[in-house]
Amino acid sequence: MSDDHAYQAISAYDQRLIQTPNIDRIANEGILFSNASVTNSICAPSRAVILTGKHSHLNGKIDNGKPFDTTQVTFPQLFQKAGYQTAMFGKLHFGNNPKGVDDFLILPGQGSYINPKFIGKKKDTIIQGYVTDIITDVTLNWLDKKRDKTKPFMMMYLHKAPHRPWWPSPEKFAEYYEKEFPEPETLFDDYQGRGSASKTAEMNILTHMQYMHDSKIRPETLESMGQVQPEIKYIRGESVVRPGPNGFMGP
């Protein structure tokens, strides 16, 4: 799961600005969803809806500040009860630890892009590096070395990116310097010079999507592990921030 990206940031849906071949492969070899609804487009409430299958007024998570009600049943608990080995790595943003997972390493709240702190099942730790790379490495290590290969598994791989502040690796940002981005009709309505600023921001967002998600766990990585044959690989966005006219942005 990624954070705050729109469907246009995946080239399986829109090829004008960005290429995400690894995500596209999942779409091409599986199912590409063309119809969707958003029950809540705020970070933690959206995740609560996804994990519980209940609307926000039923699961009680209506904002990012109030802790999640841990008496609510989440789908990892159901997998765990059914005999699956369960794990969760990345951003949860619930204000408390997840239930129904055998192993977890999650960011506190929103987390940091650089040298982030993590909350673990046994202890908290600070890991040096870039958060997207760290979450990916932890996930791959669990798949390869910590997973009980005699059991089916359910693993949640949850990225912080591309949530603001949009902070890609510097070497990746340059990939979009020469790309032309279409400008909306209202771009220059209010103040001069917005073109270059808007273009820079969009390059930043698209770089987040390509580098932080498409270039991470490739389908062939799972295949190379041989015994890893997940029945379902599911990628989705948790919520989206949409640029609007006259400088406004919102869910």
Each language-model region and where it sits:
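Formylglycine-dependent sulfatase
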Residues: M1-P251
